Regions:
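Accessory interaction regions appended to the cores of large information-processing enzymes
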Residues: 1-193
Length: 193
């Protein structure tokens, strides 16, 4: 799995050594841009038991474009604050980056879809309140913890039509063009961002 993931990041395996009981030492040459955000991926692949070290080897030739993120983005459709009820119902659609009461805006990436292709969602939709009072109808809203990512991880996730917004208090992924109509026009015209 490690070799495969490094190959996708343009890494070349130089050496593979067996260092004892269920331990291997892999030495790669890889471009620095291929290693951005890789530490968390590496720890996931090794189930937290791997150790990764990096040393700058030198400048090399351009190895080509990196494979982008395969998953689509879950994009907020309007400005406002995220609501727990909406997030709870949308968790089945993908991994969420926002939690209850987080400010969101149109074009902001609020999660990752499990499949390719972006999906515009409403994370501000509250529960419909009715005058009916029946027992046992309220469902307990349990939110899965949001994924906290470093700058390097977020930069490695960016597609060509996306941007990373950095403020003193937060990091937000967003579409370069916030308005969905303008995004579609730009896609059809093929104008680079």
């Amino acid at each position: 799995k490690i070799i495969d993931s490094m190959n996708r990041r343009k890494g070349k395996l130089l050496d593979l050594k067996d260092t004892g009981k269920d331990k291997k030492r892999l030495i790669f040459h890889a471009p620095t841009r291929g290693l951005m955000g890789y530490t968390s991926r590496f720890l996931t692949l090794t189930k937290g038991t791997g150790v990764i070290n990096r040393i700058f080897h030198g400048y090399g030739k351009f190895e080509g474009e990196m494979d982008g993120r395969k998953n689509g983005a879950l994009i907020s459709m309007a400005n406002g604050k995220a609501v727990a009820f909406a997030i709870f119902n949308l968790q089945a659609r993908g991994e969420m980056f926002v939690t209850h009461n987080d400010p969101v805006y149109e074009g902001m990436i609020v999660g990752l879809a499990p499949k390719p292709g972006d999906m515009i969602i409403n994370v501000m939709k509250g529960k419909q309140l009715t005058n009916m009072r029946t027992q046992g109808t309220d469902e307990n809203v349990v939110l899965t913890p949001v994924r906290q990512m470093s700058i390097a991880e977020q930069l490695s996730m960016l597609n060509t039509d996306e941007a990373l917004e950095i403020t003193p208090k937060s990091l937000r992924l967003r579409k370069a063009i916030l308005n969905p109509t303008e995004r579609k026009k730009n896609e059809k015209s093929g104008t680079p961002l």
